[in-house]
Amino acid sequence: MKKSVCFVFALILLAGSVCPLFSGAIDVEHYVMWIPGTANGYIGVYCKKGEVAKSPSEIPEYTNEKYFYNFIGWYDWRAQTGGTTEDLRSFVKEYYADPSWPRGEPFPEFDPQPVIEDTPYFAYFDKVPKKFVLTEGSTKATIRDVTVLLNLLTGMDQPLREGADGDVNGDGWVSIKDVTGILLYLTYGVE
């Protein structure tokens, strides 16, 4: 009896480990990055392990019409630059902080390639993304969102705890104004 129970349990574990291989799922961790100066400040996702997501349909959270005009692909800033923190800051300033972007110029050729673990890929478009319809939910970012931004822009681990600067009432949320202020300071050195 014990052997049969163990056998069934082993089959369940095996099925659980094998099924994801055939599900077509992509291991992607999402976040929204707010950059001042653009129509809505939207930038990309954070990809981890697996293939690059090639269309918004593979990212359910971002398929809403208000987020996209026409999705083109992912831009691997590490492959196109030296991959340093300063390169990322320059990338952000050049491609996303300019209110007139895009300037009728195509982004660099996108060459799909396997995702290197923990490599950020940024979404880009052939038109400026639509402006968000601001609602209670879309005017706030989580503490985790801000932490990811700080880590990307500084290369250091700077977690924001509940009650920290930016989280005025200690509820774990940060306003868009706070996020924009943080990014302005990090990218331009101004408050």
List PLM regions with ranges.
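Cellulosome-associated attachment modules in secreted, modular CAZymes
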Residues: S17-I26, D126-E191
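Generic structural signal for beta-strand residues in well-ordered domains
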Residues: C6, N64-Y67, Q113-I116, T142, ...
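Bacterial N-terminal signal peptides
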Residues: V8-P20
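Positively charged n-region of N-terminal signal peptides that target proteins for export
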Residues: M1-F7
